[in-house]
Curated annotation (Swiss-Prot):
InterPro entries: ETO1-like (IPR044631), SKP1/BTB/POZ_sf (IPR011333), TPR-like_helical_dom_sf (IPR011990), TPR_rpt (IPR019734)
Entry keyword set: Coiled coil, Ethylene signaling pathway, Repeat, TPR repeat, Ubl conjugation pathway
Gene Ontology process terms (BP): ethylene-activated signaling pathway; negative regulation of ethylene-activated signaling pathway; protein ubiquitination; regulation of ethylene biosynthetic process
The protein, known as: ETO1-like protein 1
Entry text on domains: The BTB/POZ-like domain may mediate the interaction with some component of ubiquitin ligase complexes.
Taxonomic lineage of the native organism: Eukaryota, Viridiplantae, Streptophyta, Embryophyta, Tracheophyta
């Protein structure tokens, strides 16, 4: 997917000024005369930057404070409120872009659910979130480990059975002489019943049969006008005697349920409710029964139908009948089907619907319900802000303004972006600028998104100043880099444009930034580089569409491919070896993508692709590649290796080891031994396991493999030897790895030099790595450990420029400031990074600094926020306990 919320300004036909065919109709890298004559004009309009997105997320000014509040409330609130607090925590992490953390919060909401409705909503939501992970469940089953997490629940078992009617109906007393039996006449048919049994069904029947009415003395009562069939009346009679419904058809149950409601027969209604719920066998059946359940106020049936709808997301939300039911229900009907979980329900539905189509009437309906069922300010903020984003997309500007205004007035300052954007659309550019200026001046410290948004309402140097400030405060924002790159390209400074976009691509592989760089390379006639970027983008997202979704990425890839030199299989392997050795991960991805289009050994290539994607911090794409490797494995023993990696990467280490052993049992192979060694080294706390790991890696090296993988095995073997203090053996491994151009072995060899007390040699070794590696932020960080403080500070400043998401440099600089008794400056240094990265170690260190200066309140806040990130971190728990004991 490109962007979730594309901008209106990008919806013009950008391809009117760009004909991809004309750009690519070239001979030997030269534009045709017609294309070249219009190139400057084309290129200026060709590369367009979409306006900054307004995200439909909860984005509090101080997420640390909010996480701390949630953590504190979780410690003190009643059990039934915990799920909704975890849902709020989920929304905070979603706004921060923390996928793993938000999913964990959703898991906690499900685990802490105290009602069946919460269990159904959160369980179904998790099932939706984990789409595509069914293979993991299957693999666990093959290892004898079963998961029953998200199977449909037996809804009826969570509802207490109705055991008796009112005392008046159950205890029948009368001084009047009446017969023991009564006959109900329906048309020409007569159904004989026991008067006492029928009377016990409800108070109305008791009054009818034993009350002070003339009819009460009758032995025969005509029920023909009560819209009940004789068959249904027989079911009522039988139930009055035996108390259960046996072998009753669905249609008859529906009729009996209506009858039970009419005559207030609670036990009978409950029995019908349960029986009907048990008969739901499909989506069609659930759709058919839901209207009836809501009309007749049947909670078990309604909840069971709802479970089917949620369990089948997202497909069920493409059914207009399902959507119609879920959006037209009134408050009472929502209570019938969702109990006390309506806000959770519509949070789930609106989020899934926004992923399908954020502009749809369905999304609007769900968001309006979300707002209706918000019970506090936080929930209202989320609902109104989302509603404002959706209204803005639909160009319903007045309604969008009302929603954003409400969210803003409730304290959601981020909603000011929506108000400013609306002001700009209506021609009030200065007002929009002043709105953001007011926000910036009222907040300390301001956040990056504030300057990014304000930049949209000014030009020239002012705009660039705001964008520089935005990057300084939040280097993860992509818009400033893209704008600066395109601006420099428009000034014919291609080198500066590439340097700018490479800044962010060095640490964040964002599709929109790859697209911009692709366009820059096209503008420079560098088709090989352009091809590399489009292939990398298609690796991340196979269905990626460029130019605001107007052109399929595959189409552009095909067009560019016609104008680069074709590589043979041997050429591809040489290119892969070269780029892998130079730690050029994006280049390696491109080569593998090209190789996969041939009939090469796809399993091996998809596996290599997954390794690269993990290095590039793209875990979801990496897992997709690993599953493709499994599907394309050429043998059972190869497939078992990929299954082992799938299990290991999803936290199932023992099962991963089991798969590796199964693979070795079929055939000894490099990858099976490597997997077994890797998993054992990473998971075992037993020091004696090192000898086993060494043996496994030695076995791996005896098996056939290519130099890329052998280099990795030698590098890993060297690491084990270092841990065992066998430095000579470790050095041999690293040197042998370098001989096959495993460039990262420089880092291991540097460690050996350092442990031999040769710090200068360690520094030089890391310098060699820096010179060779294209992605070298980690190398600068490691080199900083082998030099004096001033050089270390210089290296770590370089790390922050190359990859501002690496937290060690901030911690180091803060520690240096703390040593110099510059406590406030130290805390400010940590706060710089915490503003855009929810990191446990940063929060931990800042909490310790706050404790050191006696600021218990701030220390406790940071402890609680850190425990929201990792609830089981032992050192954090100890610090929290210590700080908590000092709280007044």
């Amino acid at each position: 997917m490109r962007t979730f919320y594309p901008s209106d300004s990008c919806k013009e036909s950008q391809l009117d000024s760009l004909n991809p065919q004309s750009w690519l109709q070239v001979e030997r890298g030269k534009l045709s005369s017609s294309a070249s004559s219009s190139a400057p004009l084309c290129r200026e309009s060709f590369i367009k930057v979409p306006e900054p997105q307004i995200l439909p997320h909860y984005k509090p000014l101080d997420y640390v404070e909010v996480l701390a509040q949630i953590h504190e409330e979780l410690d003190t609130c009643p059990l039934q409120e915990r799920s909704i607090l975890y849902l709020l925590q989920y929304q905070v992490f979603r706004g921060l872009g923390e996928t793993k953390l938000r999913r964990r919060s959703l898991q906690s909401a499900w685990q802490e659910a105290t009602t069946v409705h919460e269990k159904v909503v959160f369980g179904s939501w998790l099932r939706y979130e984990k789409q595509g992970e069914e293979v993991i469940t299957d693999l666990l089953s093959s290892c004898g480990k079963y998961s029953e997490e998200f199977v449909p629940l037996d809804i009826a078992s969570y509802f207490p059975a109705t055991t008796a009617s009112s005392p008046e109906a159950a205890s029948v007393k009368t001084n009047r002489s009446v017969s023991k039996n009564v006959v109900f006449k329906i048309g020409e048919e007569k159904i004989a019943c026991q008067r006492r049994k029928i009377a016990s069904l409800s108070a109305p029947f008791h009054a009818m049969l034993y009350g002070n009415f003339t009819e009460s003395l009758l032995d025969e009562i005509d029920m023909s006008e009560n819209h009940v069939s004789s068959s249904a009346m027989r079911v009522v009679r039988d139930f009055s005697v035996v108390g259960v419904l046996i072998g009753v058809s669905k249609n008859l149950l529906l009729e009996v349920l209506v009858f039970a409601n009419k005559f207030c027969c609670e036990r009978l209604k409950d029995a019908c409710d349960r029986e009907l719920a048990s008969l739901i066998s499909s989506m069609e059946c659930a759709i058919e029964l839901m209207d009836f359940a809501l009309e007749e106020n049947s909670p078990i049936l309604a909840s069971s139908c709802l479970q089917v709808f949620l369990y089948e997301m997202p497909d069920s939300l493409n059914d207009e009948r399902v959507v119609e039911v879920l959006t037209r229900v009134n408050r009472s009907q929502v209570s019938t089907m969702a109990g006390k979980a309506p806000f959770s329900l519509y949070s789930c539905l609106s989020e899934v619907s926004m992923c399908i189509d954020p502009r749809s009437d369905r999304t609007l309906g769900f968001l309006e319900k979300l707002v209706d069922f918000a019970e506090n300010d936080r929930q209202q903020v989320l609902g109104f802000h989302r509603l404002g984003c959706m209204r803005l997309l639909r160009k319903e500007y007045r309604e969008a303004e009302e929603a954003f205004e409400t969210a803003f007035n409730l304290g959601h300052v981020y909603s000011a972006t929506g108000l400013a954007r609306l002001g700009y659309i209506q021609g009030h550019r200065l007002w929009a600028y002043e709105k953001l200026s007011s926000v910036i001046s009222s907040v300390s410290p301001p956040l990056g998104w504030m300057y990014q948004e304000r930049s949209f309402y000014c030009e020239g140097d002012k705009k660039l100043e705001d964008l520089e400030k935005a990057t300084e405060l939040d280097p993860t924002l992509t818009y400033p880099y893209m704008y600066r790159a395109v601006t420099r390209m428009s000034k014919q400074n291609a080198k500066a444009a590439l340097e700018e976009i490479n800044r962010i691509l060095g640490f964040k592989l964002a599709l929109e930034c790859l697209e911009i760089r692709f366009c820059l390379y096209l503008g420079m006639d560098d088709y090989e580089a352009a091809l590399r970027d489009i292939q990398a983008a298609l690796t991340l997202c196979p269905d990626y569409r460029m130019f605001d979704g107007k052109v399929a990425g595959r189409q552009l890839q095909t067009l560019v491919y016609e104008h680069v030199e074709n590589w043979t299989t041997a050429d591809c392997w040489m290119q892969l070896y070269e780029k892998w050795s130079n730690v050029d991960d994006i280049g390696s991805l491109s080569v593998i993508y090209q190789m996969l289009e041939s009939d090469a050994c796809k399993g091996v290539l998809y596996f290599r692709q997954s390794l690269l994607l993990l290095r590039l911090n793209c875990p979801e794409a990496a897992m997709r590649s690993l599953q493709l490797a499994r599907e394309h494995a050429s043998s059972d023993h190869e497939r078992l290796v990929y299954e082992g990696w799938i299990l290991y990467d999803t936290g199932h280490c023992e099962e991963g080891l089991q798969k590796a052993k199964e693979s070795i049992g079929i055939k000894r192979s490099f990858e099976a031994y490597f997997l077994q060694a890797y998993a054992l080294a990473e998971s075992s706390l037993d020091p004696s396991s090192s000898s086993t790991v060494v043996s496994l890696l030695e076995d791996a090296l005896k098996c056939p493999s290519d130099r890329l993988r052998k280099g990795q095995a030698l590098n890993n073997l060297g690491s084990v030897y270092v841990d065992c203090e066998k430095l000579d053996l470790a050095a041999d491994c690293y040197i042998n790895a370098l001989k096959v151009r495993h460039t990262r072995a420089h880092q291991g060899l540097a460690r050996v030099h350092f442990l031999r007390n040769d710090k200068a040699a360690a520094y030089e070794e890391m310098t060699r790595l820096i010179e060779k590696a294209q992605n070298n932020a980690s190398a600068y960080e490691k080199r900083s450990e082998y030099c004096d403080r001033e050089l270390a500070k210089s290296d770590l400043e370089m790390v922050t420029r190359l990859d501002p998401l690496r937290v060690y440099p901030y911690r180091y600089r803060a520690a240096v400031l703390m040593d110099s008794r510059k406590e406030r400056e130290a805390i400010t240094e940590l706060s710089r990074a915490i503003a855009f990265k929810a990191d446990l170690h940063l929060l931990h260190l800042r909490a310790a600094f706050h404790e050191h200066i006696g600021d218990v309140t701030s220390a406790l806040r940071d402890c609680r926020a850190a425990l929201s990130v990792d609830p089981n971190h032992q050192e954090m728990l100890e610090l929290h306990s210590r700080v908590n004991s000092h709280e007044p």
